[in-house]
């Protein structure tokens, strides 16, 4: 009888923990997230002026046009193109510093930047650990400033104001380095172009 009572107690405890961890806790987090942080809880999706989603401010994407600031290189190629990994995968290349494939990729990135008259700095030739980092350093943004200003036909000072506006500071004021969110910056520049054309 004692053995059966212990089994029933174990089943009850298992059901209680299942109820708490599989239903109550996730629902509580869902309610708190949607109530206090609705934008972040739904992926921080940015929409254009027509209401069409253009990306997430948390996940980088490829920008190839001269009039856009370019993101960091991605080992997963942002799930785009022939060599891309499927959507949902993130991570670095895990190539050793002695691997010729890594050196070849870095040289290719550096040459492409030189063709654009951009000084190849670390942010612009090395991929981030996740391969999806939405930020570049302020220095990397300033390196691309002249190219973007020339392609958009505006003064570099105008672009510099936008860079400063979309620079996120250090986390809690002490952790990490300031970074520029590439999607937010590029979209703000597009909006400036639209406003300029309407005036």
Swiss-Prot record:
Subcellular location, principal: membrane
GO MF term list: ATP binding; P-type potassium transmembrane transporter activity
Compartment(s): Cell inner membrane
Organism expressing this protein natively: Nostoc sp. (strain PCC 7120 / SAG 25.82 / UTEX 2576)
Topological relation to the membrane, as annotated: Single-pass membrane protein
Entry protein name: Potassium-transporting ATPase KdpC subunit 2
Protein role: Part of the high-affinity ATP-driven potassium transport (or Kdp) system, which catalyzes the hydrolysis of ATP coupled with the electrogenic transport of potassium into the cytoplasm. This subunit acts as a catalytic chaperone that increases the ATP-binding affinity of the ATP-hydrolyzing subunit KdpB by the formation of a transient KdpB/KdpC/ATP ternary complex.
Subunit structure: The system is composed of three essential subunits: KdpA, KdpB and KdpC.
């Amino acid at each position: 009888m004692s053995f059966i009572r212990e089994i029933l107690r174990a089943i009850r405890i298992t059901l209680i923990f299942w109820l708490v961890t599989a239903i109550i806790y996730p629902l509580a987090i869902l309610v708190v997230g949607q109530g206090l942080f609705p934008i972040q809880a739904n992926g921080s999706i940015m929409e254009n002026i027509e209401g069409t989603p253009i990306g997430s401010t948390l996940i980088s994407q490829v920008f190839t046009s001269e009039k856009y600031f370019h993101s960091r290189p991605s080992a997963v190629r942002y799930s785009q193109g022939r060599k891309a990994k499927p959507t949902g995968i993130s991570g670095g290349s895990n190539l050793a510093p002695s691997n010729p494939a890594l050196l070849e990729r870095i040289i290719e990135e550096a040459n492409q930047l030189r063709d654009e008259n951009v000084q190849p700095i670390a942010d612009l030739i090395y991929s981030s650990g996740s391969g999806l980092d939405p930020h570049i350093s302020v220095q990397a943004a300033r390196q691309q400033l002249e190219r973007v200003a020339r392609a958009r036909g505006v003064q570099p000072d105008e672009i510099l104001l936008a860079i400063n506006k979309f620079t996120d500071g250090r986390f809690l004021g002490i952790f990490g380095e300031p970074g520029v969110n590439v999607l937010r910056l590029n979209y703000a520049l597009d909006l400036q172009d639209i406003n300029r054309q309407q005036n």
